[in-house]
Swiss-Prot record:
Sample GO molecular function, one term: glycogen binding
Recorded domain comment: The N-terminal region is required for binding to PP1, the central region is required for binding to glycogen and the C-terminal region is required for binding to glycogen phosphorylase, glycogen synthase and phosphorylase kinase.
Record flagged with keyword Secreted: no
PANTHER family: PROTEIN PHOSPHATASE 1 REGULATORY SUBUNIT (PTHR12307), PROTEIN PHOSPHATASE 1 REGULATORY SUBUNIT 3C (PTHR12307:SF15)
CBM21 domain mapped to chain residues: 130-238
Keyword terms: Carbohydrate metabolism, Glycogen metabolism
Subunit structure: Interacts with PPP1CC catalytic subunit of PP1 and associates with glycogen. Forms complexes with glycogen phosphorylase, glycogen synthase and phosphorylase kinase which is necessary for its regulation of PP1 activity.
Function summary: Acts as a glycogen-targeting subunit for PP1 and regulates its activity. Activates glycogen synthase, reduces glycogen phosphorylase activity and limits glycogen breakdown.
Organism (species): Xenopus laevis
Protein known as: Protein phosphatase 1 regulatory subunit 3C
Mitochondrion found in the keyword field: no
A cellular component annotation (GO) from this entry: protein phosphatase type 1 complex
Residue positions of motif PP1-binding motif: 65-68
GO biological process: glycogen biosynthetic process; glycogen metabolic process; regulation of glycogen biosynthetic process
Amino acid sequence: MPVDMAVRICLAHSPPLKKFLSPSDCRGRNFVNRFKPLRPCLSLKKESESRSNEWNRSKSRNKKRVVFADSKGLSLTSVHVFSEFKDESSLDLQFDLIDLEDITASLKLHEEKNLILGFTQPSADYLQFRNRLQKSFVCLENCSLQERSVAGTIKVKNVNYTKSVKIRITFNTWKSFVDVDCVYMNNVYGSTDSDTFSFVIDIPPNIPSHEKIEFCISYESEGQVFWDNNDGQNYSVIRAEWKSDGVHTPSPNKTDIASYEYKKKPQNNDFDQFGSPRTSAGLYPEWQSWGKIGGSPYW
């Protein structure tokens, strides 16, 4: 039967696999070993073995030892004696207490007193300022103290092209004085009837408290000299004391300071030549509030 023949062929022994391979492939190697898994690259040790290795490694290290100095014949302490007069440079650091008291007293006096202006700004009342300028041909416009210097501006009538404006100032109650030239300033608003000059004067330090600081202004043009001396009182810089609230007040021990304080002119109903709103202030006090016109300078 054909089926019996096929079964016999399948059950027959197959030829060995090495007959299909060349002799060079089988020489010197084991065919079965080629299909074995590779050995892992990481070597895993047991936990007990790692601990034993660390213990043996710690035993091999050198042990730390503490040795005292006396065991080697050395002293346990070191004593150094300082002489009281060994260093003479320390004597230079000694201060005399009396000198320190004088220094602190002068510093305290300097802190309590400062310099302030002994007059109000001339241009605060602009109409009165214009009247003085028309009358005297020269008038201080404004002034301020900047640290240790006096600065301000001056208005003069434009009489001639050639002008010379100077500040005459004294720091010792007119025992001596200095004339300082003022600098011309270009008129911003292009006024033709007046010119503006500026000045900056340094105040020397250590001025005695009893000496006065005063100045006035001279204006020379076409051989004529005009003066502005604050109506005979001169412009003064006085000393003041600081109060706890930070307000400047004149020193109480100066009796002559009252003569330099500004006295407000009593209000009257006189008509001035400019026809200003100040005239109607006496007749109709509420008139300025109607037109929202104030008494302060317009700038």
